[in-house]
């Protein structure tokens, strides 16, 4: 059978939709997991021996880094859609740097908490905080690995207005991680 141009476009379209659907399904499962954990946090908080503590101020800096990274990721994708390879590369490198800064500030915040006596095994409130922020950081690490892969591809000139799928997948997941952190941060500020 001879494959025609419309058939090739249809195969490419089907492949794109399959990857995007799988990504969305995985993000829905992550939302369910974090919803369950935050629900558990609220239920457990109502019981005795809940230790109330202030979040380290460095979490605000973490939040700024990850929000800025969302902007640089948006810029990178917009640049790729316009075939601006320089803007794409710079946007992805900035996003990668901000992701590393977010990771560093998360570890710094955990260090502050330990100095204040908030441990994973010390109290349920500390355990929930460590699990929520730690799981987010694990997902962010996965996003950073894929971001590094996409950044390498961008440096090699692989992405342009006609080839955006890996970049789009990376962008969708990165914005999801940003939104998830914002939810967790606000939740931890409001629900003590």
Say what each PLM segment does.
Residues 1-192:
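...captures the hydrophobic TM-helix bundle architecture rather than a specific catalytic motif
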């Amino acid at each position: 059978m001879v494959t025609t141009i419309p058939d090739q476009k249809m195969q490419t379209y089907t492949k794109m939709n399959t990857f995007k659907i799988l990504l969305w399904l995985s993000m829905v499962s992550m939302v369910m997991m974090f919803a369950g954990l935050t629900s558990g946090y609220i239920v457990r908080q109502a019981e005795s021996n809940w230790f109330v503590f202030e979040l380290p101020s460095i979490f605000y800096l973490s939040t700024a880094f990850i929000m800025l990274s969302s902007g640089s990721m948006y810029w990178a994708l917009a640049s790729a859609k316009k075939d601006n390879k320089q803007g794409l590369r710079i946007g992805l490198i900035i996003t990668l740097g901000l992701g590393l800064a977010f990771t560093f500030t998360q570890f710094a915040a955990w260090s502050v908490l330990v100095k204040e006596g908030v441990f994973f095994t010390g109290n349920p409130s500390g355990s929930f905080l460590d699990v929520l922020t730690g799981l987010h950081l694990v997902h962010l690490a996965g996003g950073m690995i894929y971001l590094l892969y996409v950044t390498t591809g961008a440096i090699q000139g692989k992405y342009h207005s006609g080839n955006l799928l890996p970049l789009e997948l990376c962008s969708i997941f990165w914005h999801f991680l940003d939104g998830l952190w914002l939810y967790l941060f606000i939740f931890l500020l409001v629900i003590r």
